[in-house]
């Protein structure tokens, strides 16, 4: 799916009082805002009756049965921001997997005012919130997922990531964290996990052959990879290094820890006198908080440690992780 740029195909028409959004031939009514961050706003919308055969033809297999969706609106102020949005659209179109959030439609339009363009990205809506939302709620209630749910959520996340790592060339998500994992719950079933936000995704393998290249990578990571989940080699990159998809494996280990304990594994350092998040991560200084009673199996803790190796070469690949998680699921 290419990036269409049209002044007519996407419009947030506040003047009419209807609060409607057009994306190509499809029209949506804004229900309410459900999120925001930076220059992006996320709205819950409901699709109005399709008006044309073209609109019907654009409908995808992921389209909502009840007509509700999420629309992400991005305000674009520079060519760099425009390029980033176009890249997010391009990368999102590469992947199709049940555990990766699909981009259903999009439009980028030129506008007048304080910014140059607006982008509208259409997604399925997941009202169960993110793992981060769930973790905060569970932390306040001192609740924990049972071991079986931990493993099922984590396995689904691994399946989505494997799809990206198996692409040719392999892609890294670069921002795996609880806030980018949507959760869907059905009564009597384990939660379903869906990985989202491909704005930081890039080809995973990169050769670093100078101090300048190492610093460029660190600067890029500081902007695009959330600090508590960022791999050590993205904090302090050697002048000669081969970066690969195992940066995601570190983030995956941090996320498994957060699924278990409702907190990230290294942010404890921020609450210590003289503590440093970077040093805790680079040195792999892991601490275990109080958990459920009875506690999680020691094998699950060792699974986390396996992924949180400061040296990338010591970390497993995604196929190894899936083999191991299946063994744990069989056991627990």
Regions found by a protein language model. Give the residues of each.
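Protein kinase glycine-rich loop
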Residues: 31-38, 42
């Amino acid at each position: 799916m290419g990036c269409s740029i049209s002044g007519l195909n996407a419009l947030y028409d506040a003047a009419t009082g209807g609060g409607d959004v057009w994306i190509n031939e499809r029209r949506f009514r804004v229900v309410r805002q459900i999120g925001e961050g930076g220059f992006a706003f996320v709205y819950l919308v409901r699709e109005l009756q399709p008006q044309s055969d073209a609109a019907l033809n654009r409908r995808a297999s992921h389209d909502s049965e009840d007509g509700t969706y999420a629309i992400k609106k991005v305000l674009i102020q520079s060519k760099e921001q425009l390029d980033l949005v176009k890249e997010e659209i391009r990368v999102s179109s590469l992947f199709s997997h049940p555990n990766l959030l699909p981009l259903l439609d999009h439009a980028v339009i030129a506008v007048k005012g304080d910014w140059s363009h607006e982008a509208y990205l259409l997604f399925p809506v997941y009202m169960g919130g993110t793992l981060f939302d769930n973790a905060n709620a569970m932390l306040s209630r001192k609740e924990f997922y049972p071991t079986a749910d931990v493993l099922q959520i984590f396995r689904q996340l691994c399946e989505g990531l494997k799809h990206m790592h198996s692409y040719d060339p392999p892609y890294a998500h670069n921002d795996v964290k609880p806030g980018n994992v949507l959760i869907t719950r059905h009564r009597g079933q384990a939660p379903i996990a869906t990985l989202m936000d491909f704005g930081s995704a890039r080809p995973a393998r990169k050769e670093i052959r100078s101090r300048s290249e190492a610093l460029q990578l660190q600067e890029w990571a500081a902007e695009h990879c959330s600090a508590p989940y960022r791999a050590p080699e993205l904090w302090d990159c050697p002048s000669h290094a081969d970066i690969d998809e195992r940066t995601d494996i570190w983030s995956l280990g941090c996320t498994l820890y957060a699924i278990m304990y409702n907190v990230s594994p290294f942010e404890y350092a921020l609450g210590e006198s003289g503590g440093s998040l970077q040093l805790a991560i680079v040195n792999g200084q892991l601490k275990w908080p109080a958990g459920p009673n009875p506690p999680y199996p020691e094998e699950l803790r060792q699974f986390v440690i396996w992924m949180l190796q400061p040296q990338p070469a010591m970390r497993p690949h995604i196929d190894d992780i899936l083999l191991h998680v299946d063994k744990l699921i069989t056991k627990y």
